């Protein structure tokens, strides 16, 4: 039976406070949709067609990037079936294809579910599809609807004293642009399976109906095998992640927090990176354990308008343009600390791959003990556009408005600056930097300056510049890549790929590291529930496949999809068998 809960909408983001006026009393100068580090590293490494000789630098005899201890579940009744049975794979493809054919598209602005249920009709169809496709899940698990559309599945364990495992995914997908529908190799809502390439095509195939179906199917198979979990297993499915999760995860997370309390989950698994094949034999699984922060700053130049035949030295558009020019030409400093998760990935690549130039490998491996090499490493990362933004705060002017008529001076020009906040910085530090440059321009041109309600420079006869921060999110807490919880997670990944999926590739080497997202997932609302949050989909994802997310020809390997099913199956069992709180 499904229960429905009408939960209130909480505040905008967790752990983000509106900056106070005292924060800004002194101004200081600080000198791709969701992008995972694996995609970025592959973009660089794939530019080399053959290994680079390493005669000028020897890899240390005792590598720091080591294979984790393998965790094998003793209950593995269906692992071989999931990975190798043709009929299971056909059925799994059919289930994923059916979900793709239900267009649960979400826009940037959406009505509340209670206000316009018809708007969400496809989501209700998806819920019905789940009931029909996963009958054991719906007969054995408690199913609750939070804010009408958020789905919460609870598989009660036999020992309520143990922390639950929490899996996440989202039901929604980004809209398909109807104007370029014909650009798709197969119709975007077809869920077409091409046996020759082993690809399932369609919107949501890789973001992230694949993960959602893998979680449901893994649990369904455990139930079919008669498995009884000792530890409670929870599946939380939002419905508006692609528009920041304001009505889905933002309501589901506090609902869980109220029920279970803070730090109540053993671990949280959500969408993220997978395995990257760096060369013929080397695979790196980068479970994203950190995300950058976020803040938009709305900047407005307030003038007095008038007829354009009586022009000032600079219109509000001109002042805004100069401020934008100053900000774009004074980017945030690079800050490559060795505790940045991307260093772990680079370290694995340097120790075990032959594709990096010797001087780069040396810089990576000697960075912990050599300040000069650390500088070389920073310069290397800063010189590659695909990597550099993971070691600094970014600033992009994305929206601008000003002027209404050719012969009328613009009384108001405003623009929005989007920032992705470095994991070693903060929202306050980021906004202070914008405020510094606004003050430079205000003083140069004789304008006043305000931040929210605080008057920094009184308004002048020309007008004033105003700043306001919006949608603030601090960088995510970095989840540990050591300790008991991580060891079970990494050991499950290691066993699944090293000993099962790649078992016939005798010289294959798999390593598991942390990773970093420059974007944000629904996990931003779940920080209070666990310190162990890993954003990971257990599949091998080629670079060309990842590039299709949110784009034309989104697709996924069916083999990668069933490997994700196997991971869910094994991970639940392993945490039950080896986990302790």
Curated annotation (Swiss-Prot):
Chief site of localization? membrane
What general EC class does the enzyme of this chain belong to? hydrolase
Catalytic-site annotation from UniProt: 172, 241 (proton acceptor)
UniProt membrane topology term: Single-pass type II membrane protein
Sugar attachment sites: 54, 76, 335, 428
One short Pfam name that applies is M20_dimer
Q: Which residues lie on this side of the membrane: Cytoplasmic?
A: 1-29
Q: Which UniProt keywords apply?
A: Carboxypeptidase, Glycoprotein, Hydrolase, Isopeptide bond, Membrane, Metal-binding, Protease, Signal-anchor, Transmembrane, Transmembrane helix, Ubl conjugation, Zinc
Q: Which domain of life is it from?
A: Eukaryota
Q: Per its Swiss-Prot or TrEMBL entry, what cofactor is needed?
A: Zn(2+)
Give GO MF terms, alphabetically: metal ion binding; metallocarboxypeptidase activity
Give the GO cellular component terms, alphabetically. membrane
The record describes how the cofactor is bound as: Binds 2 Zn(2+) ions per subunit.
Annotated coiled-coil segments of the chain: none
The entry's Zn(2+) 2-binding residues are: 170, 207, 270
- Segments on the Extracellular face: 47-581
Instruction: Give me the segments passing through the membrane.
Output: 30-46
> Where is this gene product found?
Membrane
Q: What is its EC number?
A: 3.4.17.-
Q: Which residues bind Zn(2+) 1?
A: 207, 242, 550
The covalently linked position for Glycyl lysine isopeptide (Lys-Gly) (interchain with G-Cter in ubiquitin), per the record, is: 17
Family recorded in the similarity comment: Belongs to the peptidase M20A family.
> Which PANTHER family does the UniProt record give?
N-FATTY-ACYL-AMINO ACID SYNTHASE/HYDROLASE PM20D1, N-FATTY-ACYL-AMINO ACID SYNTHASE_HYDROLASE PM20D1
- Name of the protein in question: Putative carboxypeptidase YOL153C
Its source organism is Saccharomyces cerevisiae (strain ATCC 204508 / S288c) (Baker's yeast)
């Amino acid at each position: 039976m499904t229960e429905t809960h009408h939960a209130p909408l909480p505040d905008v983001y967790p752990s983000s406070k509106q900056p106070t006026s005292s924060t800004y009393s002194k101004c200081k100068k600080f000198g791709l949709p969701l992008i995972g580090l694996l995609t970025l590293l592959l973009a660089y490494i794939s530019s080399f067609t053959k290994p680079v000789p390493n005669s000028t630098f020897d890899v240390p005899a005792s590598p720091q990037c080591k294979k984790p201890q393998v965790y094998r579940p003793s209950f593995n009744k269906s692992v071989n079936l999931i990975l190798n049975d043709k009929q299971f794979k056909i059925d799994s493809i059919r289930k994923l294809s059916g979900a793709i054919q239900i267009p649960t598209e979400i826009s940037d602005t959406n009505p509340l579910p209670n206000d316009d249920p018809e708007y969400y009709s496809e989501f209700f169809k998806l819920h019905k599809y789940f009931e029909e496709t996963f009958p054991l899940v719906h007969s054995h698990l408690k199913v609750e609807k939070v804010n009408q559309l958020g789905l919460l599945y609870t598989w009660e364990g036999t020992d309520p004293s143990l922390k639950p495992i929490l899996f996440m995914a989202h039901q929604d997908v980004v809209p398909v642009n109807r104007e370029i529908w014909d650009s798709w190799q197969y119709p975007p809502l077809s869920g077409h399976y091409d046996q020759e390439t082993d690809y399932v095509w369609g919107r949501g195939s890789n973001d992230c109906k694949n993960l959602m179906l893998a979680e449901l199917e893994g649990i369904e198979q455990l139930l079919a095998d008669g498995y009884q979990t000792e530890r409670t297993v929870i599946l939380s499915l939002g419905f508006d992640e692609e528009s920041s999760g304001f009505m889905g995860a933002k309501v589901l997370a506090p609902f869980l927090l109220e029920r279970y309390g803070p730090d109540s989950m053993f671990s949280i698994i959500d969408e993220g990176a997978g395995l990257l094949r760096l060369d013929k034999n080397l695979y790196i699984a980068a479970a994203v354990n950190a995300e950058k922060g976020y803040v938009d700053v709305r900047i407005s130049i307030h003038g007095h308008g008038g007829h354009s035949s009586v022009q000032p030295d600079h219109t509000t558009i001109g002042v805004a343009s100069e401020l934008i020019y100053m900000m774009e030409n004074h980017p945030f400093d690079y800050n490559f600390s060795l505790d940045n998760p991307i260093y772990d990935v680079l370290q694995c690549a340097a120790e075990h791959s032959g594709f990096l130039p010797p001087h780069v490998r040396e810089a990576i491996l000697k960075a912990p003990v050599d300040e000069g090499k650390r500088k070389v490493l920073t310069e290397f990362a800063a010189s590659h556009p695909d990597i550099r933004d993971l070691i600094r705060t970014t600033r992009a002017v994305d929206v601008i408005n000003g002027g209404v008529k050719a012969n009328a001076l613009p009384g108001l020009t405003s623009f929005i600056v989007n920032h992705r906040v470095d994991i070693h910085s903060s929202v306050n530090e980021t906004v202070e930097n914008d405020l510094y440059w606004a003050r430079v321009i205000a003083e140069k041109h004789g304008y006043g300056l305000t931040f929210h309600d605080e008057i920094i420079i009184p308004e002048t006869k020309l007008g004033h510049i105003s700043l306001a921060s919006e949608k603030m999110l601090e960088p995510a807490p970095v989840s540990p890549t050591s300790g008991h919880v991580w060891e079970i997670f990494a050991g499950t990944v290691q066993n699944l790929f090293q000993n099962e999926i790649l078992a016939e590739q005798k010289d294959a080497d798999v390593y598991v590291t942390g990773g970093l997202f420059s974007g944000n997932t629904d996990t931003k609302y779940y920080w209070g529930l666990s310190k162990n949050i890993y954003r990971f989909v257990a599949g091998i994802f080629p670079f060309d496949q990842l590039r299709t997310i949110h784009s034309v020809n989104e697709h996924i390997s069916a083999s990668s999809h069933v490997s994700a099913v196997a991971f869910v199956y094994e991970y639940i069992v392993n945490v039950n068998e080896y986990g302790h709180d």
